[in-house]
Amino acid sequence: MSRSDLDGLGYRGKVVVITGGASGMGEAAARLLGELGAVVHIADIAEPTVACASFTRVDLADPASVTSATVGLAKIGPIDFLFPIAGVPPHAVGALTCMLINYVGTRQFTESLLPQVRDGGTVCLITSTAARGWLHHLAENLAIVALDPLAVGAFYEANPDKLRDGYSTSKELLTVWIHQAAIALAEKRRIRLNGIAPCATGTPFMEESAKVLGQAFMDAYPHPLLGRMPSGEEQAWSLLLLSCPLNAAVTGAVLATDEGNVGGMITGALTAAYVQAR
C-alpha cells in the first residue's frame, strides 16, 4: 500500500512540529509523517537525517534553549499537530537531567507552542510503561504538576529521594499532566491531548539501556503475544493513528502500546522477576 492511499489519515499538507526527530520513535514518526505528505518541522539536540521542512536545535534540559527554539518555531504559522516526543533514559544523562528533559523541558516546549496550535488541533506525547505507578503516587504527582514546570528541577534538587530514577517519575508526571490538561484544552479550544505508553522498543534508547541493564535483564523482559520488542516504526504508527482526525473522540487518553505488559502485571496474568513495586 502506498502512502498516498493513506490520505484519509489527514496528514497531507498539515503543519507538524516534532521533537526527538533525529532518532528512535521520533525519527520513525518524522519519516512517516513526511511520507504521508505532512510539512514536518523537527526540533532536537542532534541534527536529523530524515528530510524535513526545517530543523531547530534545542536542548530540552536548558529552559533558555527551549525558549529560543519555541520563539523561532512560532513563526512558522499555525500548527496542526504537535508531537513533543523526545526522551532519554536516566543512565544516559543522570536522574535529574532525565527529569528536566522528559518532563520539564517537554512541558515547557508544549505549553510555549500551544498558542500556535490551531483550535481543533492535536498534541500527542510519549510516556512509558515505567509510568505504571502514576495512580499509586497520584497525590504527589498532582502536587508537582501544579508547580511551575521551571520550579520542578529545584524541587527535586531539594528532595532527591522523591526523584527516584528520574525516568519513571518524569513519565508519571507526563501521564498525570495529559489526563489533567486535556480537559481545559478540549473545553476552550477543542484541542486533543493524548499520549502513548510504549514498552521496551527496538531503538537506540534500548540499545543504550541494554549496556547498563545487562543482557540477562533484556533476555528476561516479558514480550507477551508478539514475542519480540516492537520496532520504533510500529510505535510511531500508534502515535500517528491515535492522533489522526479519525480518532476525533479521543482526548485525555494514554494508549498502552506495550504488548499487554502493564495490564498483565496489574491483573497478575504476567509476572517478571525484575518488576518491583514503585
What kind of feature is each model-predicted range?
Residues A51-A64:
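Rossmann-fold cofactor-recognition segment
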Residues V88-A92, D119-E187, A200-G202:
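Catalytic loop of short-chain dehydrogenase/reductase
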